[in-house]
Amino acid sequence: FVSVPVIIAAKSLKIPSIVHESDVTPGLANKISLKFAKKIYTTFEDTLNYLPKDKADFVGATVREDLKTGDKHRGYQLTEFNNDKKVLLVMGGSLGSKKLNDIIRQNLETLQESYQVIHLTGKGLLDNSYVGTKDYIQFEFVKDDLTDLLAITDTVISRAGSNAIYEFLALRIPMLLIPLGLDQSRGDQIDNAKHFESKGFGKTILEDTLTENELKTQLREIETNRDDIIKQMQTYKESFTRQDLFQKIINDALSE
């Protein structure tokens, strides 16, 4: 909502503004800003269905440039893992998810039959009783080393924020998405997750249906269909390079 007064002020000063919607369905701030903005760009093509045709353009996602520079050797050093077994990365979002953390730990022995597990728990949610456990390592949060961990990741369990899931897509990492529920959000992550599942990029479990059995079932589905999922991911191409998008912003802002 911080952007709304800025967009309104820009309009009053006759300064053109362009807003961006990263989720499938537009949020309230962008719905308000749209009345004063010249254009709105969307990450998802389906978002165009919710917006006026004369103002909305689909531009896709432009992921950060360093994403594909992760070092596998460094990733294995950080985790003390190896390439003998697949790596499962579990990300519960910046605040973590107690429910997801509990289910991962309760099913750790089963998961370890197929995976080495990197568990990003969220701040204050480490469990010291698991320190030193074979094929399992936990971090509260990882920033600078995340690209190295992604470089060794075969499958990811994650929330469904658009930036994160497009990064997994760019890296061709099959994903099991557990979006924030309606009790914690407006449902944007649910829409994002369902969209990605419909494209064949992975599977979705709603948080209120997250159980041990459902987790095992969906991970099994992903592994059974891994090759098909990756093939589907390979059909995705970025709509704009960073330079092309920069030029589009200039052209749209200056056009009459």
Please describe what each predicted stretch is.
Residues 227-239:
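A short, well-ordered alpha-helix in the C-terminal region of glycosyltransferases
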Residues 1-13:
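An aromatic- and histidine-rich active-site surface loop
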Residues 11-76, 81:
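Active-site-proximal region of nucleotide-activated glycan assembly enzymes
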Residues 158, 174-186:
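Short hydrophobic beta-strand element within catalytic cores of glycosyltransferases
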Residues 74, 81-155, 190-194, 205-213:
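Donor-nucleotide binding loops and adjacent catalytic segments primarily
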Residues 199-227:
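C-terminal "capping" alpha-helix adjacent to the active site of nucleotide-linked donor transferases
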Residues 139, 151-166, 173-174:
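Acidic donor-binding loop of glycosyltransferase active sites
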Residues 221, 239-256:
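C-terminal alpha-helical cap of glycosyltransferases
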